[in-house]
Each structure stands twice: as C-alpha cells, then as structure tokens.
Amino acid sequence: MGSLSGLRLAAGSCFRLCERDVFSSLRLTRSSDLKRINGFCTKPQESPRAPSRTYNRVPLHKPTEWQKKILVWSGRFKKEDEIPETVSLEMLDTAKNKMRVKISYLMIALTVVGCICMVIEGKKAAQRHESLTSLNLEKKARLREEAAMKAKTE
C-alpha cells in the first residue's frame, strides 16, 4: 500500500514537471496560434501581403467659424483669412488648450479683483460702523416696534 502511494506521488510530480516544460515551451502569438519556441512546431507560412493603405498623413479637419475664431484668438494665426481650408486635429486641440489656459487666467484675475473690491467695501462699511451684528439688531428692534404697534391697534 505504501509503495503504491509513493508511486502515485512520483508519477504526479513527473507529470507536473512534464506539464510545466510543455506549457513553458508554448506561447500565444498574435493570430492565436500556438507556436513552439524551439522550432519543432511553426506557424503556417503565409504569403506576405502588401498593406492596403498607408496612414502616413495626419487626418485633416475643416474648421468651423467658431474653431477659426479660436485659432485666431489663441495666436496661431493673425487673421481668419490666413487659416487654411483644412487643419490638423492636433492644431485645433492645441488652440483649444491655449484658450482654456487664457480663460482660466482671466477667471483667476477676476477673482482676485473681486476679493480686493470686497475688502475695500468691508473697510468702508466698518468706518461707517455698519456690521452684520448692528444691522441685525436694528432689524430686530424695528420688527419689535412694528409688532408692538400692531398689538396696540388690535
């Protein structure tokens, strides 16, 4: 009984070694054919095909009026008349990105100007002794007076 289990273990380890060697020598190629590395199994010979189309050119795009304005505003061209009939998509993307950056700089500048204006207005209000606390107290006093007047008339 003991020799049978030993034989089974030896056979299993031998099988695993062979399996590992077989699968390590096989690999998957692009056309999903199995190919043996050491050359015993080879891929079927295929006749070389001439490429049907070559894509050496950059795809061109006819810009719309809005895209032409973006190209001019981004500084790529001086006038709309200078823009060719077709431009590359990469050129349009670059112009759009430049415009995004310019617009974000403008928004940053407007935010800073707005903050400065609010600080100046706040200082002027402080000189007039206007604060949220004083305004709320005045409003509550006025509402109490109106409520008292309303209670007297009823």
From Swiss-Prot:
It comes from the Eukaryota. The keyword Transmembrane applies. InterPro entries: DUF1075 (IPR009432). GO terms for cellular component: cytosol; mitochondrial membrane. The keyword ATP-binding does not apply. It is found in: Mitochondrion membrane. Keywords: Apoptosis, Membrane, Mitochondrion, Transmembrane, Transmembrane helix. Pfam families: DUF1075. It is a single-pass membrane protein. GO terms for biological process: cellular response to hypoxia; neuron apoptotic process; positive regulation of apoptotic process; positive regulation of release of cytochrome c from mitochondria. Residues 76-102 are annotated as: Required for proapoptotic activity. The chain crosses the membrane at residues 103-120. Belongs to the UPF0389 family. Interacts with HSP90AB1; HSP90AB1 is essential for FAM162A mitochondrial localization and pro-apoptotic activity. Interacts with VDAC2; the interaction is probably involved in inducing mitochondrial permeability transition. Proposed to be involved in regulation of apoptosis; the exact mechanism may differ between cell types/tissues. May be involved in hypoxia-induced cell death of transformed cells implicating cytochrome C release and caspase activation (such as CASP9) and inducing mitochondrial permeability transition. May be involved in hypoxia-induced cell death of neuronal cells probably by promoting release of AIFM1 from mitochondria to cytoplasm and its translocation to the nucleus; however, the involvement of caspases has been reported conflictingly. This is Protein FAM162A.
